[in-house]
A protein has these predicted regions:
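Short, Lys/Arg-rich flexible segments
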Residues: 1-77, 84, 95-133
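Aromatic/pi-system hotspot detector in well-structured domains
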Residues: 89-91
Length: 133
């Protein structure tokens, strides 16, 4: 018996036809939730290194899995929601800023990108493990 895989969309369509769309979505949502919990936990640990009031850590949340507009991809959004409005400062902290012609790099400069890159392998392993279950 031989297997020929032509592309991911075809494989997904075949799996959906065997197991059903709702079952596949529930399985992928479970995998996304588990992997995003790992990422949030890792990100919160990294944010501890430059914590001031702790508001950025407290307001860090994740959305429920949703379907991206214009594609069939499922995703989870990491966002900062709360009374301290940390969402306004996260961008400045991640990318730095310029004031009076001088570039400033805060203590938390690039921490989200670094954490994302460092945890990518483990994130994918969690997704694979959950999808195989």
């Amino acid at each position: 018996m031989s297997v020929e895989i032509k592309g991911i969309p075809e494989v997904l369509n075949k799996l959906e036809s065997v197991y059903g769309k709702q079952a596949m979505q529930a399985k992928s949502d479970r995998a996304l939730n588990k992997a995003s919990e790992f990422f949030i936990k890792t990100l919160k640990k990294e944010f501890e290194s430059f914590k001031d009031t702790g508001a950025s850590i407290e307001e860090m949340t994740k959305s429920k899995p949703y379907t991206k507009v214009g594609s069939q991809e499922r995703a989870v959004l990491i966002e900062w929601v709360g009374p301290m409005n940390r969402k306004n400062i996260i961008h400045l902290n991640e990318h730095g800023y310029t004031r009076d012609g001088k570039k400033y790099t805060p203590r938390g400069f690039g921490v989200i990108a670094k954490t994302l890159a460092a945890s990518e392998r483990k994130y994918r392993e969690i997704i694979k493990k959950e999808l195989v279950r």
